[in-house]
């Protein structure tokens, strides 16, 4: 069943997955989700949605059933318009980045390289492979991430992950045969909110109060405290060539809105203009978005499959014998009818 979550409904104070990092070469990191004890909440929402506020499709492909130890390919398609560029950390256009969060059933692992299909090997050579989200917790090695990468380097905008199912018949097995869920979240572009709730330069900026725009300054330098993942310390980041809008309310109190480079001021935002609380000051520069999908996969018992095949074969033989017997009876009846001159 397809589930895509609109992050705004869940607030803006959670840690981000895939949000901007200071270096231009590190535009977004799904690894920020590691700050959560559970990156996939009980509601089914993956925490990446907390900071990627736009909804975009994510498509996954897995087989309906698999056998123990039989490697299969998990395919994750992250579609986007290749003509569009995202807003970089300095406000300039930058290549669209894509990344993914993958939660396999417990016991399912990434296959060894010698077991990869040719298609999976070619894909991994392009995007670099998966990384455990909780590197310090081997028991949670089924939760993986694909860190942000330039989407133009990923053929077909598709990640392929070779997965090996466990064998419940193994001596130390902790899993059973049955149905399990595979959960995937994928984003394209940077997030709109940092871990501490501060908006990034891919967010739309609104007026915090109603009043009169008393000043509009361009080319402004200012500093914001940005937190790059839950549990990390917020650090100062200096924006240059930003915009500062001052709004004075009816009591004469001034509110200042510092806008980093990236969002563009609307034509209506001019000195002396009247504005309402919540009214947009800028356009929405975000061209990316996040989506998540889940699929059921059945870990089949080979013995059960064998018995099923045997049962179907026996049923087929029985039906065949019945057909042959019926034809035999019909021939006997036809012969007796001819003998009696009927």
Swiss-Prot record:
Kindly give the PROSITE patterns that the UniProt entry links to this protein: CYTF
Residues binding heme: 48, 51-52
Alphabetically sorted, this entry's keywords are: Cell inner membrane, Cell membrane, Electron transport, Heme, Iron, Membrane, Metal-binding, Photosynthesis, Signal, Transmembrane, Transmembrane helix, Transport
Predominant location: membrane
TM region(s), chain numbering: 305-325
- Name the coenzymes or cofactors required: heme
- The answer, when asked if Membrane is one of the entry's keywords, is yes
Location of the protein in the cell: Cell inner membrane
One GO cellular component term: plasma membrane
Signal peptide per UniProt? 1-28
The note describing how and how many cofactors are bound reads: Binds 1 heme group covalently.
User: How does the UniProt record describe the way this protein sits in the membrane?
Assistant: Single-pass membrane protein
In alphabetical order, the GO MF annotations are: electron transfer activity; heme binding; iron ion binding
The record's annotation in SUPFAM superfamilies points to: Cytochrome f subunit of the cytochrome b6f complex, transmembrane anchor, Cytochrome f, large domain, Rudiment single hybrid motif
Could you tell me the superkingdom of the organism this chain comes from? Bacteria
Set out the biological process GO terms recorded for this chain's protein: photosynthesis
Under the heading InterPro entries, the entry gives: Cyt-f_TM (IPR024058), Cyt_f (IPR002325), Cyt_f_lg_dom (IPR024094), Cyt_f_lg_dom_sf (IPR036826), Rudment_hybrid_motif (IPR011054)
How the protein assembles, per its UniProt entry? Answer: The 4 large subunits of the cytochrome b6-f complex are cytochrome b6, subunit IV (17 kDa polypeptide, PetD), cytochrome f and the Rieske protein, while the 4 small subunits are PetG, PetL, PetM and PetN. The complex functions as a dimer.
Q: What does this protein do?
A: Component of the cytochrome b6-f complex, which mediates electron transfer between photosystem II (PSII) and photosystem I (PSI), cyclic electron flow around PSI, and state transitions.
Q: Which family is this protein grouped under?
A: Belongs to the cytochrome f family.
Protein name (Swiss-Prot/TrEMBL): Cytochrome f
Q: What is the lineage of its organism?
A: Bacteria, Bacillati, Cyanobacteriota, Cyanophyceae, Gloeobacterales
């Amino acid at each position: 069943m397809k589930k895509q979550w609109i992050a705004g409904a869940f607030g803006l104070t959670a840690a981000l997955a895939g949000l901007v990092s200071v270096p231009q070469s590190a535009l977004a990191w799904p690894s920020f989700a590691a700050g959560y004890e559970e990156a996939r909440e009980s509601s089914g929402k993956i925490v990446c949605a907390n900071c990627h506020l736009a909804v975009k499709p994510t498509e996954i492909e897995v087989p309906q059933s698999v056998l123990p130890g039989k490697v299969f390919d998990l395919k994750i398609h992250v579609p986007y318009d290749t003509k569009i560029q995202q807003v970089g950390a300095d406000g300039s256009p930058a290549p669209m980045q894509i990344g993914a969060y993958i939660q396999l059933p417990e016991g399912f692992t990434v296959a060894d390289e010698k077991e990869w299909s040719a298609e999976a090997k070619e894909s991994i050579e392009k995007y670099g492979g998966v990384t455990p989200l909780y590197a310090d917790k081997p028991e949670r090695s089924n939760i993986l991430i694909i860190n942000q990468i330039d989407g133009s380097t990923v053929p077909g905008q598709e990640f392929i992950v070779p997965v090996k199912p466990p064998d419940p018949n193994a001596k130390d097995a902790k899993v059973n045969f049955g149905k399990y869920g595979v959960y995937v979240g994928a984003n394209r572009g940077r997030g709109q909110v940092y871990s501490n709730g501060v908006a990034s330069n891919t967010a739309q900026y609104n007026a915090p109060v109603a009043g009169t725009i008393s000043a509009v300054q361009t080319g402004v330098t200012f500093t914001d405290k940005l937190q790059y993942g839950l549990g990390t310390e917020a650090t100062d980041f200096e924006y240059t060539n930003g915009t500062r809008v001052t709004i004075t309310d009816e009591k004469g109190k001034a509110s200042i809105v510092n806008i980093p480079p990236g969002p563009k001021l609307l034509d209506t935002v001019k000195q002396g203009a009247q504005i309402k609380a919540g009214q947009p000051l800028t356009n929405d520069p975000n061209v990316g978005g996040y989506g998540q999908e889940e699929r059921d996969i059945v870990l089949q018992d080979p013995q059960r499959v064998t018995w099923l095949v045997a049962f179907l074969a026996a049923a087929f033989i029985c039906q065949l014998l019945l057909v042959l017997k019926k034809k035999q009876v019909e021939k006997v009846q036809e012969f007796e009818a001819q003998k009696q001159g009927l």
